[in-house]
Amino acid sequence: MYELLRYCGCKSRNLFYSHKPFYNLFFGYGHVFPRDLIVETGFYQTDFFYGMEEYDLSYATVKAGYSILFTKEILVIHKQNPNGREPSVVKQARMFENKMIVVYKHLPWLYVMTHFIMWSAFFLYKSKGSILVYFKTILSMLRRMKIARRNVIGASGMQYLKDVQARLWY
């Protein structure tokens, strides 16, 4: 166990490729970061109430030169309490908006566009065609994008994401 956690904070990508199994998945409900990484990249974005904050942290992690280790050696139990959840359409709207903010901040424009198309369709499907909520979400998204700091992942970070088969298109 210590061995796995020790490798989680390693800045050398080659170490993962040559010595340890590597998976590109990152779960928001169970993760560990080295303190130095959080000091370097910052913590959760304060305007993310729910959804996609793990993507924001993982892209910041890659930009800082770290690798992400996913291991099946650790068990996390994540209980979802339906009494503590927002209505489904609100939850879907937050996820759509937050995902787009994260992609806008970290990925090249091509991926911003493909995410917008795919997540628009997904939101409209999951919300049973809630057009009014869709347009309100887009207006809120555009307001947040005006103040979000855009700092796109560089070529080596993008290559890393492609190497680990990260989900870039949607």
Short names for language-model regions:
Residues 41-42, 80, 103:
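Activation segment
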Residues 35-36, 64-65, 106-108:
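Short loop segments at secondary-structure junctions
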Residues 94, 110-170:
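Non-catalytic, C-terminal membrane-associated alpha-helical segments of glycosyltransferases
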Residues 58-59, 100, 139:
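Non-transmembrane alpha-helical segments in soluble domains
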Residues 1-42, 46-47, 55:
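Acidic/His-rich active-site region of diverse nucleotide-sugar glycosyltransferases
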Residues 77-97, 132:
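Nucleotide-sugar-dependent glycosyltransferase catalytic core
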Residues 39, 46-49, 55-77:
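Catalytic donor-sugar/metal-binding loop of nucleotide-sugar-dependent glycosyltransferases
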Residues 96-101, 106-110:
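Catalytic-core region of carbohydrate-active enzymes that cleave or remodel glycosidic bonds
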